[in-house]
């Protein structure tokens, strides 16, 4: 994809506001935007309205943004900022590049992911389904459509439609095993299927998939994701009433995550909730 400069222009932007907004964008938006081919730049703007805009093929594309949303006071507000940005990005990409383009499909997928972080699973599902339709049209069944099958499965899982979710998750796994072999994406599929089966109280089956996820991540050396798989395995053992094994796995996962120092990541926050639920302890203990 061509690299394009994307500008988020805000009037009367103070230094501390720039730093605050940069922090939220870095955590939820910037790296995904870079994957899409955009270089995000913040700058002051002479007009009254805040806008997100870029130039493509000698034409300017812009979307207005409510300035009040851009300076979050907490994590929830920060997510709303990033949701707003990705909503604007989907419109910009559709107008600039066309509906059935990878630009638009990617932006839809990222909007869906951000909505999932905000527990808006039904809205996220619609984004993933639309992105899947575009990517199947463009690429057929490949790694990109597998991403959407996986995300659709997770969204259905989140809204409690576990059997439907399982169908999509299995489809993603089938493609990833065929196209990628032992790969992080394949490990992710095994991990997500384990979660899905656990939600349906099929814990012995979930155990098989969780172990396969860990085996791949051990082989490729993805320590951070190994911790996430260990966390899931601990939850399964807890459901099987093997508290000792569950505690040992959680302790190991926590040690790995503490080594990264990512105390505010979504993964660590999730693990804190899990440990509090099972053992009544915080992640730091």
Q: Where is each model-derived feature located?
A:
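N-terminal alpha-helical interaction modules that lie
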Residues: 8-81
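Conserved alpha-helical positions within TPR/SEL1-like repeat arrays
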Residues: 71-74, 102-117, 144-158, 184-199, ...
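Eukaryotic all-alpha helical interaction scaffolds
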Residues: 93, 135-136, 176-177, 217, ...
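Structural signature of alpha-solenoid helical repeat scaffolds
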Residues: 99, 140, 181, 221, ...
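TPR/TPR-like (Sel1-like) alpha-helical repeat modules
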Residues: 244-261
